[in-house]
Structure formats: structure tokens, C-alpha cells
Curated annotation (Swiss-Prot):
Assembly with partners or alone: Part of the 50S ribosomal subunit. Forms a bridge to the 30S subunit in the 70S ribosome.
Domain of life per record: Archaea
Bilayer-crossing regions: none
Family designation: Belongs to the universal ribosomal protein uL2 family.
One GO MF term attached to the UniProt entry: structural constituent of ribosome
Function text: One of the primary rRNA binding proteins. Required for association of the 30S and 50S subunits to form the 70S ribosome, for tRNA binding and peptide bond formation. It has been suggested to have peptidyltransferase activity; this is somewhat controversial. Makes several contacts with the 16S rRNA in the 70S ribosome.
Organism annotation: Nitrosopumilus maritimus (strain SCM1)
UniProt feature, compositional bias: Basic residues: 1-12, 234-244
Pfam families in the cross-refs: Ribosomal_L2, Ribosomal_L2_C
Chain positions covered by the region annotation Disordered: 1-30, 203-244
Name of the protein described by the UniProt record: Large ribosomal subunit protein uL2
A biological process from GO: cytoplasmic translation
Amino acid sequence: MGKRPLVRRRGRGGNQFRSTSTGKVGTKANYPRFPLSEQHEGEIIDLVHERGREAPLAKVRFEDGSVSFVPAVLGAKVGETLQFGLKSKIEKGNVISIQNIPDGTIVCNIEKHFGDGGAIVKSAGTDATVFSHGDEGVTVKLPSGKFTTLNPKNRAMIGTLAGGGASERPFMSAGGKWRNFKAKGKKYPIVRGVAQAAYVHPHGGGRHQHVGQSSTVSRDTPPGAKVGSIAARKTGRARIKERK
């Protein structure tokens, strides 16, 4: 049996391709699953950094003694009190259903589906804007500029997520960039396919570096061969037809 290509081994998901658990908080940074009708308060007891995550996390302790980790908003500090519930005040760090958030309010860490604990607008320094309320749901303007309509019961955190500008900091060495990608389980550096051996990549091998075949492959190409221009509508330079 021949040796499997690297792309197939990555698809299998072995330990060498997964992000390490070292430096993790040990639990997901989601909203605690409180009933929607209940009102809870928690105190920020610590601000922690999780490996592979640019935005800091707030360690929150509630009145019943339970502890949860949630993404920290810009300006959060130890000792502050966060409110979770429908009757929470419109202040930074509080978690409220978007049906009770006024139009024009800046929010982050929004639930895509009710009860998922926050799934969108979770990157460092990002925020969204509650645009309007309607019969179909609440319309939110995302950081990309697109609009999405969500369930009014979905929860969101008031404010802008902390850690903005972290992605603008330049990498001073290739090793620093490698460690950053390693913590996130991403591949770095990326080697060109034509520079690899024939058994490693479909574009590899030969007396000189060339693809040797069409670089466009179909959408249903099996793993290992699915490299190059995947389901491309057109490739190459655009030709401008001269008008007669």
C-alpha cells in the first residue's frame, strides 16, 4: 500500500493536526444555560487569556457559586457585575435577548440559534448593530456589512468585543507565526504543490516545476486529488472583446 498524501492525513484529523489543549480554559466560552425568564448576576473575578484566542475571556462567578467563561467586552475589568436576563440594563457586558435591545445598540457574541451560547461576532475587536425589529425577527448588521434576521429570543452581549488590533500586530519572525498557527491548529507554512514530490501532491514531481495537467477539478473530487482550482467557473486572464 502506498503512502497517503498529506491532505488526506489532515482530513483524517490525527492528533498532530489538531490544536493542542495546553493553555485552554477547559470549557467552552458560552453563555450559561439559564431559563429565559430568570434574572441572574455574576461578578468578573478574573480576565484570562486562552491559547489560540485573541479576545480575552472573563471568568464570571454567579450567586449560586457556579463559574462560567464568557468573551470580555472592551472596558471590562475585575470586580464588575454582569447581568443575564430579560430585565438586564443596556450596559456594556450585560447579556440580553435581542428583542429587548433598542435599535442602534452595539452588540457582540450573538446567538445564531436560541440557546447555543453565542456563535457569531466573536472575533477580537468586532461588533454588530441591532438594526430593526419586525414581525419576522430582529435584523442585525454584521461586521461584514451584511444584514441577517435572527430569532428575537436569541441573546447578545452589549458592547464591542475586547482585543481589537491584535491581528494588526506584525509577526517579527517566521517562528512566531508558526506558533500562532500551531495554537489554532492551522497549517503553516504552506508549500506550493509543484515544489513537492509526486507521491505527496498531485502537482508534484517532474524535471521542472509544472502542474502537468489541468489544475481545475470538480466539486466531488475525492480527498487527496481535490487540489488546485476547485469547481472554478473560469480561470486565466479575462479577455476583453473588441466592439465593432
